[in-house]
Amino acid sequence: MKIHLNGEPHNAEAGTTLEGLLMGLGFAPEKVAVERNKAVVSRGTYGAVVLQEDDQIEVVHFIGGGQHPPADSWSVAGLTFNSRLLVGTGKYKDFEETKIAIEASGAEIVTVAVRRVNVSNPNAPMLTDYIDPKKYTYLPNTAGCFTAEDAVRTLRLAREAGGWDLVKLEVLSDEKYLWPNNPETLKAAEILVQEGFKVMVYTTDDPHMCKRFEDLGCVAVMPLAAPIGSGLGVRNPYTTRIIVEQAKVPVLVDAGVGTASDAAIAMELGCDGVLMNTAIAGAKDPILMAHAMKHAVLAGRQAYLAGRIQKKLYATASSPLDGTFF
């Protein structure tokens, strides 16, 4: 038997009811409205209405008005992500808290350090038992490395362990300030790029250095906002803005974020994303802070896209003065 369903020819078995048609299509009868031959059919009678040859059936439901906004995704090394918040996996009280916080943050990329296994307890829990590498993009880093040699060794092992080519390179100058050692970082970056690694590089908020790393072949530059773990926020928005304007690769603020407003400021400057660890893991309530950071990054990004008003010395009335009665 042939009927017309939403303007298109449709075959139905003889004796099929409206309810049977809807269920066969996968629609819950209580979520739609049906018109048969231009007459609305009462929902309570769907099971009793038997379809006839050439019936004209319209099935409708509610949708939101307007168009869905386009996804504001970003890409690095050929991979596309929706979340612009990247998070670390250290400093949490246990792996369970790590898992819950990452889920709350909405992050898709998580940084992981490479460390020796516990040979005395091979059954000890590992991060991969809680954070699924198939669900999240692991970003191996070189945290704790102070020489180019150590950084390169670390990432070679990371690639062997998980097959990861996308990596975060950081080479530090000292243990007190954890400031980037740019000469050693450059040396390591050159080797890693030649070996096929896709390097996201942690560096100072220096436009010249960021440009050098980009020219070397790094797929993203990650200037610090402030020293690692300091929570001081974006200390030099001027140079961060210059880095964003000149870069042809993603720019992500890395290190120094302390609270949600810091993340929002970084995004308002036009950064493609923000990476943080201590700001979430070190909070009194890491799970709640993870939620806050998720919304802060989104708010900052939307504010950047919307375009802030110009800063001015004098006031401008928001209500028109024309038509006042005094």
From Swiss-Prot:
Q: What is its main location?
A: cytoplasm
Per the UniProt record, one Pfam family is ThiS
Stretches assigned to coiled coil: none
The highest taxon in the source lineage is Bacteria
From the UniProt record, give one GO term of the biological process aspect: thiamine diphosphate biosynthetic process
Q: Where in the cell is it found?
A: Cytoplasm
Keywords (alphabetical) are: Cytoplasm, Schiff base, Thiamine biosynthesis, Transferase
**EC numbers:** 2.8.1.10
EC primary class: transferase
Catalytic activity, per the record? [ThiS sulfur-carrier protein]-C-terminal-Gly-aminoethanethioate + 2-iminoacetate + 1-deoxy-D-xylulose 5-phosphate = [ThiS sulfur-carrier protein]-C-terminal Gly-Gly + 2-[(2R,5Z)-2-carboxy-4-methylthiazol-5(2H)-ylidene]ethyl phosphate + 2 H2O + H(+)
Q: Which residues form the active site?
A: 168
GO CC, sorted alphabetically, is: cytoplasm
Enumerate the GO terms in the molecular function aspect. Answer: thiazole synthase activity
Q: In which pathway does it act?
A: Cofactor biosynthesis; thiamine diphosphate biosynthesis
Write out the residues that bind 1-deoxy-D-xylulose 5-phosphate: 229, 255-256, 277-278
The UniProt entry's sequence similarity note says: Belongs to the ThiG family.
* Function as written in the Swiss-Prot or TrEMBL entry: Catalyzes the rearrangement of 1-deoxy-D-xylulose 5-phosphate (DXP) to produce the thiazole phosphate moiety of thiamine. Sulfur is provided by the thiocarboxylate moiety of the carrier protein ThiS. In vitro, sulfur can be provided by H(2)S.
Assembly notes? Homotetramer. Forms heterodimers with either ThiH or ThiS.
Protein name, UniProt field: Thiazole synthase
**What organism does the record attribute this protein to?**
Magnetococcus marinus (strain ATCC BAA-1437 / JCM 17883 / MC-1)
